[in-house]
Amino acid sequence: MFFNNASGFEEGYAKKDNLEIYYRDYGPVGGIPVLLVMGLGGQLTFWPPYMIKRLQDSGYRPIAYDNRDMGLSTRFESNPTFLSNYLKYYLNIPIKSEYKLDDMANDAVMLLDYLNIDKCHVIGMSMGGMISQILVANHPDRFHSYTQIASMVSTPNPTNGPSFRVIRLLQERAFKNATKEERIDRAVRLVSTIGMKGYNHNTKEFRNEVGQSIDRSNDDTGFILSLIHIWR
């Protein structure tokens, strides 16, 4: 994880009806737009600053945003439980949710329209890769290319989904009474479990980055909603 403190960007809200999507347009205005779609539980600040700079130096205009229910974007009121919905997912019982990944893809289109961008490249990470697949499938004329990072092309199921150890760590993220330090410890355990083996994530830099993301947006309730949309 990297907390992106890159300077010189334009930021604001793309608005439609009761929905507000918070974005950062890193520029330059004359660059070729690249839409960055973050994954499950991630904020726009998670995109590495060196990646932003490399894109800019290569003539591109990176644009990142917070998915709904994440970061500074609109929050939805429903409060689903992790365990009951995971059991439905595991038993192949239909899951109800307030919106779908298709709606999250429409949020990205709304942002492009707001910024008057007719066509761009798109890069999606994890759940953002799933959202981006829907984007390019439904709006092929709006994208030059599509890059998928650490994602998949189908809905995960109990045979190819996360291990029970990862599921347990994800479930802990739904605990509302966790302290900031407990949340930082949990992030270290999660990234150590799913990240590159042998790499030490429990560093002062990483812990500071997680702490900054918590300070930016202290509400983790949208994480469960997003996870349900992947299971649905």
Describe each PLM feature range.
Residues 2-20:
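N-terminal cap/lid segment of alpha/beta-hydrolase-fold proteins
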Residues 19-91:
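Conserved HGGG/HGGXW glycine-rich cap/lid loop of the alpha/beta-hydrolase fold
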Residues 95-98, 102-120:
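Conserved acidic catalytic loop of the alpha/beta-hydrolase fold
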Residues 122-124, 149:
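Short beta-strand immediately N-terminal to the catalytic nucleophile in serine-hydrolase-like folds
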Residues 129-140, 146:
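Short glycine-enriched nucleophile-adjacent loop
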Residues 146-178:
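Flexible "cap/lid" loop of the alpha/beta hydrolase fold
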Residues 181-226:
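Conserved alpha/beta-hydrolase catalytic His-Asp/Glu region
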Residues 228-231:
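Conserved small/polar residues in nucleotide/adenosyl-binding loops
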